[in-house]
Structures are given as C-alpha cells and as structure tokens.
Amino acid sequence: MYSPEPLKGTLQTILLKVLKDHGKMYGYEITQRVKELSEGRIHLTEGSLYPMLHRLEAEGMLKTETVLMGKRVRKYYALTAEGRSLVKERLNELFDFIKTISTVLQVKIT
C-alpha cells in the first residue's frame, strides 16, 4: 500500500477516470474498484473519498442519484458533461507531470 502523500495529488484524477470507465457508482463501490484496479496498493479512506466526491459535485463535475436499497439509502455518483471533459484534462496533466518527474529524477518509467 502506498503512503497517502502521493495519492493526494492524484485522487481527483483517479475518481474521475473510474467514474468515466464504470458509469454511476456509490462510494464503497468506488473504493473497491480502485483497490481492485491497483491490485490492493491503493486504499481509499472515507476521509479522503467523500470530501473529494462532495467537492466535485459542488463544482458541477458530478451528479448524484439517491436510491433506497431495502432500509438503506445509497448515493450514486456519475460524471456530468463538464466532468467528462475534465477527465481528459486531468489525465493529460498527470501524464505530463509523470514525464517531467521522471526526467528530473533521471529514471525511466516502464
């Protein structure tokens, strides 16, 4: 598992990309998908996940749908059109940043 520091700068991009690829999802489902995709190396906590989801919703990047599942309420998150365009922008920024960091550190990314 990675330390939380590198994750802080990439959390938004991770969430946007997962939602782009998988459509509407609820919070726990997002955490499990990220854990699966990262082969267990990234564990999202509620303390990092939900504030970011709420921020993205407030900025108009996400829309929500509340569904009653038995006696529980489940809140689903999905990208808006603006959120879908932000995914591309954030991915390009991240790839450029990784390239720059690898140059600065003089390491080759494989």
Task: For the regions a language model picked out, list residue spans one by one.
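Beta-hairpin "wing" of winged helix-turn-helix
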Residues: 57-73, 78
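Intrinsically disordered, low-complexity serine/threonine- and proline-rich regulatory segments
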Residues: 1-7, 90
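Basic, amphipathic "hinge/linker" alpha-helix immediately C-terminal to the N-terminal HTH DNA-binding motif
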Residues: 72-91
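Basic amphipathic alpha-helical segments that dock to polyanions
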Residues: 49-56
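Short, contiguous hydrophobic alpha-helices characteristic of membrane insertion segments
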Residues: 4-5, 61, 110
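N-terminal helix-turn-helix DNA-binding core of bacterial DNA-binding proteins
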Residues: 5-48
